């Protein structure tokens, strides 16, 4: 077979034989590091990879040849938890945060999520589209090729649908692949204050059926937290969503452990998010139910909290984990997955191999794209992040700098030395 593109002489390729399930426990410590590696691409797919000189049959008169001495290649990075589409920003709350006002106290004062809800409700489709596109551009420049994007800053049907429509439009227009999550249960809207059940009924009866019918989202999520939605309320919504055919996620055990992990396990959610306050019993329940733990260390960093999710304990117990930005205007205003990956080492005490597995193959399973992306594997799409680094440890050791040299998306050179092509 003659390749369309042949990428050769990488210092290292980060490869993996996809086992057919998210990596758990000791599996997360394993990878195949190919020295002097090459990747052959045809019709947007990986058709061969190996070490040394490529087979002669891969090279034709039209084959594009590129050499990458001094560089490494990983699968395209996957950010599987973002709140991508929103209006406004919340830097005006930064002084309060520095003064020690808590996240929940800011929310109780009408700020936080509710502040962004007001800004998003007043924002036009074009405003939201352009703002979200800029964030996606930034992510792409940092090696991200697939992104999960939630609604949740409307808390009414008109605005929630506008957010989902923006995601759908960007999925068509932007190189990054987007996976949509419906999260109208992100907070209790002011017009339903004191009556969350009534709001959940509106979501179940009036919103979810339309989202499903119009194929606006693949996943449904809820914020199960003290002073937001209880475990029973979360179970009520997610069980109805599951009956309608949605895959499930749940924000759980971020600030307090109030039963969200139990709901995730009972309903076989794909993932439980945050988990800073998870208990040993909660870890065991998620492992037993096969729920992926999606950890968001940049949120803990941004909130200036001391308690990070117990990633080391989770992996050692046999759990599958992912790492994501939680990109949002309040608790985590970043879109930099390289920073998150570095926090995975510095604050969660994971190894570079564990982090790379978390943000590639496990993240692919988390967004239900494992058949297409998540590993440098023959037959998968050629989503490739190329780092200006001599080995896979270097991007973690040399932190706070964008080390992306190039990005390939579906076999096309999409980013070249800081420019989107």
From Swiss-Prot:
Per the similarity annotation, which family is this? Belongs to the metallo-dependent hydrolases superfamily. HutI family.
Q: In which pathway does it act?
A: Amino-acid degradation; L-histidine degradation into L-glutamate; N-formimidoyl-L-glutamate from L-histidine: step 3/3
One GO MF annotation is: imidazolonepropionase activity
Stated role? Catalyzes the hydrolytic cleavage of the carbon-nitrogen bond in imidazolone-5-propanoate to yield N-formimidoyl-L-glutamate. It is the third step in the universal histidine degradation pathway.
Report the cofactor remark. Answer: Binds 1 zinc or iron ion per subunit.
Major location, coarse class? cytoplasm
Q: Where in the cell is it found?
A: Cytoplasm
PANTHER family, alphabetically? IMIDAZOLONEPROPIONASE, IMIDAZOLONEPROPIONASE-RELATED
Q: What is this protein called?
A: Imidazolonepropionase
- The enzyme's main class, written as a single word, is hydrolase
Any one Pfam family match given in the protein's UniProt record, by short name: Amidohydro_1
Binding residues annotated for Fe(3+), in chain numbering: 81, 83, 251, 326
Cellular component terms per the entry's GO annotation: cytoplasm
Positions contributing to Zn(2+) binding:
81, 83, 251, 326
Enzyme Commission no: 3.5.2.7
Give the matching SUPFAM superfamilies: Composite domain of metallo-dependent hydrolases, Metallo-dependent hydrolases
Catalytic activity, reaction form: 4-imidazolone-5-propanoate + H2O = N-formimidoyl-L-glutamate
**Residue numbers binding 4-imidazolone-5-propanoate:** 90, 153, 186, 254, 331
Q: Which cofactor(s) are needed, names only? A: Zn(2+); Fe(3+)
For this UniProt record, give its keywords in alphabetical order, as a comma-separated list: Cytoplasm, Histidine metabolism, Hydrolase, Iron, Metal-binding, Zinc
Task: Give the originating organism.
Answer: Streptococcus pyogenes serotype M1
- Amino acids binding N-formimidoyl-L-glutamate: 153, 328, 330
């Amino acid at each position: 077979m003659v390749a369309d593109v042949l990428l050769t002489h990488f210092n290292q390729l980060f490869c993996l034989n996809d086992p057919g399930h998210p990596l758990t426990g000791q599996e997360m410590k394993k990878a195949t590091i190919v020295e002097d590696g090459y990747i052959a691409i045809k019709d947007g797919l990986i058709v061969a990879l190996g070490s040394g000189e490529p087979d002669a049959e891969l090279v034709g008169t039209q084959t594009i040849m590129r050499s990458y001495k001094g560089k490494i290649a990983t699968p395209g990075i996957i950010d599987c938890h973002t709140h991508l589409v929103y209006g406004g920003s919340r830097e005006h709350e930064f002084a309060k945060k520095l003064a020690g006002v808590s996240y929940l106290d800011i929310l109780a004062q009408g700020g936080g999520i509710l502040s962004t809800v007001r800004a998003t409700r007043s924002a036009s489709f074009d405003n939201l589209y352009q703002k979200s596109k800029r964030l996606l551009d930034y992510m792409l420049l940092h090696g991200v090729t697939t992104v999960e994007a939630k609604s949740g800053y409307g808390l009414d049907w008109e605005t929630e649908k506008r957010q989902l429509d923006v995601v759908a439009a960007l999925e068509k227009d932007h190189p990054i692949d987007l996976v949509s999550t419906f999260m109208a249960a992100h907070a209790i809207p002011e017009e339903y204050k004191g009556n969350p059940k009534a709001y959940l009924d509106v979501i179940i009866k009036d919103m979810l059926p339309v989202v499903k019918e119009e194929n606006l989202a693949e996943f449904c999520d809820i914020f199960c937290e003290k002073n937001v939605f209880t475990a029973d309320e979360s179970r009520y919504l997610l069980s109805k969503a599951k009956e309608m055919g949605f895959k499930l996620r749940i924000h759980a055990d971020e600030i307090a452990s109030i039963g969200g992990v139990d709901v995730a396990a009972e309903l076989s959610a794909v993932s439980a998010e945050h988990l800073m306050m998870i208990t040993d019993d909660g870890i065991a329940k998620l492992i037993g139910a096969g729920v992926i733990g999606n950890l968001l260390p940049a949120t803990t960093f941004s909130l200036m909290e001391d308690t990070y999710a117990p990633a080391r304990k989770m992996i050692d117990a046999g759990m599958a984990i992912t790492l994501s930005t939680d990109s949002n205007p309040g608790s985590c205003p970043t879109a930099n997955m390289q920073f998150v990956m570095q926090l995975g080492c510095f604050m969660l005490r994971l190894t570079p191999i564990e982090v790379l597995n978390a943000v590639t193959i496990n993240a692919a399973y988390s967004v239900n794209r494992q058949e297409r992306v998540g590993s440098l594997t023959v037959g998968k799409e050629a989503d490739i992040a190329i780092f200006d680094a001599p080995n896979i440890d270097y991007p973690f050791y040399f932190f706070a700098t964008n080390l992306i040299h190039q990005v390939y998306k579906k076999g096309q050179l999409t980013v070249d030395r800081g420019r989107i092509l």
